[in-house]
């Protein structure tokens, strides 16, 4: 397969979808890799580095889209790219479709297969391609929030960690997943008092055991959100429903409860935001104010620490990219339900329920798009029906038992959060 890697064009997006080390592995598997010129510059990788790894340097986005069967990116395609996406082409990137009807309709119209990093899902419910960037964004949320608390940026002039004789700041983190936990850890490390809200009691029990003593896991409810907003100096929105629009948990009316100069960092902005007054911003113009509350809603936060982010992203995506390149996207989806979960749009059909629900579009199960003889495996994309019936039953039984054993262990450990 010819695999293309594009230079990102979103404002101040310095990441690239593949490192030279990743390219080397794709080439070792017999694939041709085309890298748009200067694609890795923002992450410290030159065209020469990619050529040494075996890549071909391509002069333009058009050349990449025209010549490559699979195109890899970091952020979603922008409108200028929509006409370049071809029928049958695989686009492998963060899409966050639920935040953009325009993007969703463009990919439907293209006839391409959209494999979204953020919905590739393991049997235990974890999101392996979202996790590394969630870790980065969670850590950055507190760094950025602490900065904009400074008076020179319009904040209240408060140091989160305080100093001897002066009280520490208070941080409210809404959501106890990967983003929330990483944000809470950084805030605790600075010495702040941290309230970490989540709706899953088993998860809260786990967090109570593992988080530092200045972190207080609390049940998430409208009443508790209102209560802790009044105390908070920094609020981090870290809510996620995979593939779907984020719920609006902080309403405009709630801003009136907050102290002037408080900072909100809405990491959920990729999925529409969990704060009613949130709208996407950029690294060029990252903040705005509503009712005296500073909002930081940069949709590509990890792009500012591109060297770390690019390596972490490649570590996560490369195994899946290799499977798609080696087998083709249909066979890869049939054999690996994790990849099947990542397919949001294929052949003009919406194959991910959260995306269809976000815009009132028709949802088509992936197995119907793949065809009547190509069924999914036990929990996502089907056993091979070419096997004898008894063998199929045994395969499904064994896979189902293994899946539920894994899910039960994950639930007990807190890694699996039930709605």
Give the residues covered by each predicted segment.
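Rossmann-like adenosine-cofactor binding region
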Residues: 209-291
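Adenosine-phosphate binding glycine-rich loop
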Residues: 118-159, 269, 274-379
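Glycine-rich phosphate/diphosphate-binding loop of Rossmann-like nucleotide-binding domains
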Residues: 7, 11-29, 34-40, 155-237
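Short glycine-/small-residue-rich Rossmann-like dinucleotide-binding loops
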Residues: 69, 75-76, 95-96, 221, ...
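An N-terminal-biased, well-structured beta-alpha scaffold segment characteristic
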Residues: 2-110
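Generic hydrophobic/aromatic pocket-lining and core-packing "Φ" positions
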Residues: 23, 47, 104, 142, ...
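Glycine/serine-rich phosphate-binding loop and adjoining beta1-alpha1 elements at the start
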Residues: 2, 8, 79-169, 298-300
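Rossmann-like nucleotide/phosphate-binding core characteristic of flavoprotein oxidoreductases
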Residues: 2, 33, 349-396, 404, ...
């Amino acid at each position: 397969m010819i695999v293309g890697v594009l230079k990102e064009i979103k404002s101040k997006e310095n990441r690239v979808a593949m490192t030279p080390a990743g390219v080397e592995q794709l080439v070792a598997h017999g694939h041709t890799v085309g890298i748009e010129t200067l694609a890795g510059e923002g992450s410290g990788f030159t065209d020469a580095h990619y050529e040494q790894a075996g890549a071909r340097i391509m002069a333009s986005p058009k050349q990449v889209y025209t010549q490559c069967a699979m195109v890899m990116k970091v952020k979603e395609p922008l409108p200028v790219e929509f006409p370049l996406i071809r029928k049958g082409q695989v686009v492998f990137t963060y899409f966050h479709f639920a935040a953009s009807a325009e993007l969703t309709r463009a990919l439907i119209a293209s006839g391409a297969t959209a494999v979204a990093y953020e919905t590739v899902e393991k049997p235990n419910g974890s999101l392996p391609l979202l996790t590394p960037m969630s870790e980065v964004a969670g850590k950055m949320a507190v760094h950025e929030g602490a900065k904009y608390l400074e008076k020179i940026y319009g904040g209240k002039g408060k140091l989160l960690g305080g100093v001897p004789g002066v009280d520490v700041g208070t941080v409210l983190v809404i959501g106890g997943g990967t983003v929330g936990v990483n944000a809470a850890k950084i805030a605790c490390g600075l010495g702040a008092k941290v309230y970490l809200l989540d709706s899953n009691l088993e998860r809260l029990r786990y967090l109570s055991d593992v988080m530092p003593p200045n972190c207080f896991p609390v049940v998430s409810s409208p009443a508790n959100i209102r209560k802790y907003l009044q105390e908070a100096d920094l609020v981090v929105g870290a809510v996620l429903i995979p593939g779907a629009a984020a719920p609006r948990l902080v309403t405009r009316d709630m801003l009136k409860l907050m102290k002037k100069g408080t900072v909100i960092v809405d990491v959920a902005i990729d999925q529409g935001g969990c704060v009613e007054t949130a709208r996407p911003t950029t690294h060029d113009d990252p903040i705005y104010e509503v009712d005296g509350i500073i909002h930081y809603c940069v949709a590509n936060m990890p792009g500012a620490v591109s060297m770390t982010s690019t390596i972490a992203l490649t570590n996560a995506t490369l195994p899946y990219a290799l499977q798609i390149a080696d087998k083709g996207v249909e066979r890869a989806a049939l054999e690996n339900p994790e990849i099947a979960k990542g397919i949001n749009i294929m052949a003009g059909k919406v194959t991910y329920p959260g995306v269809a629900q976000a815009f009132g579009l028709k949802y088509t199960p992936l197995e119907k798009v793949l065809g009547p003889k190509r069924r999914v495996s036990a929990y996502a994309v089907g056993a091979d029906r070419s096997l004898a019936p008894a063998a199929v039953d045994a395969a499904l039984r064994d896979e189902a038992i293994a899946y539920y054993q894994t899910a039960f262990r994950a639930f007990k450990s807190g890694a699996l959060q039930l709605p």
